[in-house]
């Protein structure tokens, strides 16, 4: 990479933010990147062949959560929990209309080993389902706003939720912080990020691969967009990365890694 041409520059915005702007027209060639560029080690885990362990469907979110000793994967028959060796433990929740069930799919999840909890966010809903790691339902967390294709981060020490939401025109907030009782602490209105008219083929990306909480919108319609970082002190989304497509934007989304941005 050190011999590759420079295709991006840092730009200072009127608000004083530093944003990296990639000029797509400067990309003239392709290179082969070894996997070791992005990871120092990896492990393949066989999830087994037992009927109850089979992942039958991952559409409608396909949420996967990995912690040091657990793997959680959404399947059409529930959210399946495995240990780090791939041994099936149990299923959490199920599709239905019960108090601990979801209507369509599990869209995001988080495993908190320290506190023996798994948190599941349905694709559409007003609560986060909570289970212990043995599969027992716990009191749910009410959401301050309803979510659509949302993402979340749990601060288990402060007992806070950071929730990202699809910025539809009727969405109350596109990002907010709340406590575990549902009390709203901070929020950001969608503003210029609004998707009008609402289109469920769009999505949001919150990769959480760095110490920053990143946020970007995937548009099914070709458009120019930006990857943001949440600035908690100022309670705003600060621009961090974008691509200059000139007059010909292509279908894409962004993923942020500790030392790289991926455009795919």
Over which residues does each language-model region extend?
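Blade/loop signatures of beta-propeller domains
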Residues: 3-47
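Short loop/turn segments that connect beta-strands within beta-propeller blades
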Residues: 83-87, 132-136, 178-183, 230-234
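Asp-box/WD-like beta-propeller blade repeats and closely related beta-sheet repeat scaffolds
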Residues: 103-104, 121-173, 184-196
């Amino acid at each position: 990479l050190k011999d590759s041409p420079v295709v991006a520059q840092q730009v200072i915005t009127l608000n004083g933010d530093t944003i990296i702007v990639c000029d797509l027209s400067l990309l003239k060639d392709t290179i082969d990147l070894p996997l070791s560029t992005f990871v120092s080690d990896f492990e393949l885990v066989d999830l087994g062949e037992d009927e109850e362990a089979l992942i039958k469907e991952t559409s409608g979110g396909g949420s996967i959560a990995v912690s040091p000793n657990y793997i959680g994967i959404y399947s059409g028959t529930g959210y399946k929990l495995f240990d780090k060796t791939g041994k099936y433990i149990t299923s959490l929740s199920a599709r239905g209309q019960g108090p601990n069930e979801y209507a369509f799919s599990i869209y995001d999840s988080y495993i908190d080993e320290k506190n023996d909890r798994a948190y599941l966010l349905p694709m559409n809903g007003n609560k986060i389902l909570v289970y212990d790691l043995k599969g027992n339902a716990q009191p749910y967390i009410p959401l301050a706003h309803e979510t659509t294709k949302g993402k979340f981060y749990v601060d288990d020490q402060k007992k806070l939720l950071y929730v990202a939401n699809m910025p539809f025109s009727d969405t109350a907030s596109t990002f907010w912080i709340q406590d575990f009782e549902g009390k709203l602490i901070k929020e950001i209105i969608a503003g210029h990020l609004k998707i009008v008219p609402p289109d469920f083929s769009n999505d949001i990306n919150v990769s959480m691969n760095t110490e920053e909480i990143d946020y970007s919108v995937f548009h099914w319609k070709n458009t120019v967009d930006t990857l943001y970082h949440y600035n908690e002190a100022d309670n705003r989304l600060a621009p961090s990365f974008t691509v200059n497509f000139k007059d010909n934007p292509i279908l894409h989304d962004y993923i942020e890694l500790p030392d790289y941005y991926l455009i795919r």
